[in-house]
Amino acid sequence: MDIDRRNLMKGLLAGGALLALGTPSWTFADEPAKKAKRCLLFLGGANVDGRFANGVRVACQEVKYDGLETMKVNGGLLSDPGKLVSLFEQSKGARWIAVMDDASAAVFQELARTAGARLLSVGAHASVKDDACPLRHTWLAASPAQGAGAVLASRLIDAGESFSIIESFLDGSSAASKPTSWSAPGFASYRSSGSDAMHLHCSGLSLLEGCAQLGLTGVEGWTPIPSHVSQREVVSRQSPQWVESVGYAVAASALGGRIPESCSSRAFVHRAFTPHSLPPTQRFVSFVMDI
């Protein structure tokens, strides 16, 4: 099965916030620095700010990065966009990790584009009232090196919630390189045929069920990924709080050192056999970018 990346993009844009934002018109980074010398956490006034920030700080502690700067817009980004413009001017050369609600994200995107920001990743995150899949995450990233989905999957697997994570990489040139993949206990991993290879990691679902959950038809053209090309993501501490896990994953990708996969896109689907009560409905957007 040759998966058209444009079809995957449609799935990403159907995720909620990315539909509202549209495909970013600003510049995606071509070769961003692997390690951030200066990292800034921007809290856009969303109700998830505190939990997201906790996850970011844990990730910084694990890699012994103690230079994190935190900026917050009280009352939300829409109440004072001028402050954001000033922050962009004052933080040239910094790597930004940002979180905000959907409405603020549209304003943030335009102001960042005008400031010449180079985007590494943008993600839409949601908890919904759906027993089959209450936690849903979609990402656009410059390349597999900026992917955060594998880290998030490793953090969520023991949280007792079913989830789906979809990532698309604008630079998918690594798909034709030496095969590399991610692995975790309980996941079965597959690779699609074709030049725009996709990796699919399923836990608690068959390949057919995983494809159906993602809106992919049929299982033809998928082959199991051999274990000898796979590496396990090391996550030292789990968290029952999914928003904190998103903050951790986003920061881990921003700080570098994650496991890239040789693919143009990838997805993680997990079905919890003893799910917890459904989390409250929430939606927010995350960004990683260089100014």
Name each region found by the language model.
Residues E31-K37, S86-G93:
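Flexible, charged surface loops at secondary-structure boundaries
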Residues M1-A29:
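N-terminal export signals
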Residues G45, K64-S79, E89-I291:
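Long, low-hydrophobicity ectodomains and other hydrophilic envelope-associated domains
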Residues G22-A59, V63:
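C-terminal segment of N-terminal export signals and the immediately downstream linker at the start
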Residues A20, S25-W26, A59, R113, ...:
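General N-terminal targeting signals
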Residues F28-A29, K83-L84, R271-P275:
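Intrinsically disordered, low-complexity boundary segments flanking structured domains
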Residues G50, D80-G82:
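Well-ordered, non-membrane alpha-helical segments in soluble/globular domains
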Residues A53, R57, L84-F88, F108-A112:
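Short amphipathic alpha-helical segments and helix-helix/interface helices
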